[in-house]
Amino acid sequence: MAVQSSGSDDLSGCIRQCDWDENDVCRSCGTDYSPPKKLRPFHLAFPVDNLEKAKQFYVDTLGCTTGREKQESCVFKFFGHQIVAHLVPQMPNMSTNPVDGRDIPAMHFGIVMEWDDWHRLKDKLNKDGVEFVIGPYTRYEDQPGSQATMFIVDPSGNHLEFKSFKDESAIFDSDW
């Protein structure tokens, strides 16, 4: 149910009869009814042992564009976010943790995608012959928090997860 606020004098739109402050936050229950803020891009720096192979993978396989490039690093636009590959002499060891009966790389990054976009990427990766670390499947099927997920690895051994929720309200839900 969408709740509209026109200031603390109008309580008609709230099922709890909230008393909104000047920032559209309820004084009694603390619910924030303010309009969503524009999501800012996140930044992630990660190690690679071959910058040229990393550029080829992130541009050709994932469709990223490059930004600043130096001899020891390269900036990528990763689904609207900034990631930076840093050349290192040796890659760190990677550990896994069991999740839903599978060994999930403990260190990984990725993106939560729209349902249709996730399926398009899955189809592209399959068509391009990209090897999956964990192939596309639905984690927690028919449970709260159900999500489509898949893991791939870049040429330096960094794991990437791409996931999608049919019910996006479950992304940050603590009940599952």
Say what each PLM segment does.
Residues 46-92:
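Core segments of cupin and vicinal oxygen chelate
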Residues 26-52, 108-109, 113, 164-176:
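N-terminal beta-strand motif that seeds the catalytic metal site of vicinal oxygen chelate
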Residues 30-33, 94-99:
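Short beta-strand/turn micro-motifs at beta-sheet edges
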Residues 4, 13-15, 30-35, 40-49, 77, 96-176:
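Vicinal oxygen chelate
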